[in-house]
Regions:
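Aromatic (phenylalanine/tyrosine) cluster motif
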Residues: 12, 18, 24-33
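Anion-binding (especially nucleotide phosphate/pyrophosphate-binding) glycine-rich loop
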Residues: 74-106
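Short beta-strand-to-turn element immediately C-terminal to the catalytic PLP-Schiff-base lysine
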Residues: 61-64, 87-88
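N-terminal, positively charged, Ser/Thr/Ala/Gly-biased leader segments
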Residues: 33-54
């Protein structure tokens, strides 16, 4: 269902919304991609470690429950960030997060972790002053949001 058989032929429509935020990453961009009417996918581009637009270290973040790893890899290759994080909510305190470079599925990424929890916070999925857990290839790690 989410599989792209011919990524070279995929046509994407982009719309961007810019919003300032006042946490680890001050600026983010939110895009929506539509692939030939089959899949609408929203993702964030969050600049970690900065308080200025287009500064810091950018990471892509996708919050989606139903993406397979083949699609995640192709998407990361398409958007070409050093890392793109794909988040699946397990329950209110636990998240499965997969990190992809344009060429590989990797164990962990620091700036993409910060970007992931910023996206979760901005989307209302998590709250300030709480501890959450993320399952990654590197194991299950605690993340404090405050």
């Amino acid at each position: 269902m989410n599989k792209i058989d011919n990524p070279a032929a995929t046509i994407f429509e982009k719309t961007a919304i810019y919003k300032e935020i006042n946490r680890y990453s001050k600026y983010y961009k939110h895009f929506k991609f539509r692939s030939k009417g089959e899949l609408a996918l929203s993702y964030y581009v969050i600049d970690a470690f900065t308080d200025t637009k287009f500064g810091g270290n950018p990471a892509g973040v996708v919050i989606n429950e139903n993406l397979d790893e083949e699609f995640m890899q192709k998407f990361a290759e398409e958007v070409r960030f050093s890392e793109t994080a794909f988040i699946k909510k397990i329950d209110s305190k636990n998240f499965d997060i997969k990190f992809f470079t344009p060429t590989a599925y990797v164990e962990l990424c620091g700036h993409a972790t910060i970007a992931s929890f910023q996206a979760l916070f901005d989307s209302g999925a998590i709250e300030d002053n709480n501890t959450y857990f993320m399952k990654t290839l590197a194991g299950t790690l605690a993340v404090e949001v405050n």
